[in-house]
Amino acid sequence: MDKIIARLAEVNDSLKGVIDIAHFNDEAKIGKGQEMVDKLTKLIAIFQRPELNFSKNKAEGDDIIGDAYEYLMRNFATESGKSKGQFYTPAEVSRILAKIIGIDKCTDHDATICDPACGSGSLLIRALSEASFEISGYGQEKEVSTAGLAKMNAVLHNKATIKIMAGNTFSDPQFTKENDSSELERFDYIVANPPFSLKNWSDGLKEFGRFSGYGDRPPEKNGDYGKYYYTVRHA
């Protein structure tokens, strides 16, 4: 299984570092010997169920695979509790935020949009879907595994051109000016549903001029205003 997935990643750059980082022979996660065989057999059997064959039910314009992926993420977030749910923005919230930023009225084909705390990418993808034409999307996510989810989410929603980067937006911002890496890149639209009330958010902080002109740096025990300042500097 690992070899097959590795081959898929080799011929698809957007899937490198995404589908090939999970291993089906990881004894720490799925056990050893017969236990591993049984678990993998059950997993494969799930995807062989007739009800999961959507080929005869796909209507024009439907995005069944992408929607199914979001369904799985939503239920994982719900079942895992609030701490795990931070990587997923509910579809209803995503739709409202996408409408608020007015991207549906965009007329600039060179416009850009960024989500500096993109999680699984659901909010960024929804916002891009509101535009009347394809525009460039960018997202950054602190957790490497969640950034992988975002990349896969983008591919399954036919948004493979979205650039998803892993890293802490405070200590390691990934989107900086090409001619000046000390200055943050600017975007036409910013959309985000960041984790609130972060503690010790300033650990390893790199300024990038994010707080100049706004008085004192936000308190260490509450990173909400830090996120706000960061968003303003990126816009």
List PLM regions with ranges.
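A mobile, often basic/glycine-rich helix-loop segment
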Residues: 202-221
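Hydrophobic alpha-helical scaffolding
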Residues: 33, 58, 139-143, 189, ...
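Conserved Class I SAM-dependent methyltransferase catalytic core
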Residues: 220-235
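Conserved S-adenosyl-L-methionine
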Residues: 83-192, 197-201, 208, 228
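Short, structured coil/loop segments at alpha-helix boundaries
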Residues: 8-15, 37-40, 58, 143-144, ...
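Alpha-helix N-cap/helix-initiation motif
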Residues: 38, 42, 83-86, 135, ...
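Non-catalytic, mostly N-terminal accessory regions of nucleic-acid modification and defense proteins
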Residues: 1-105
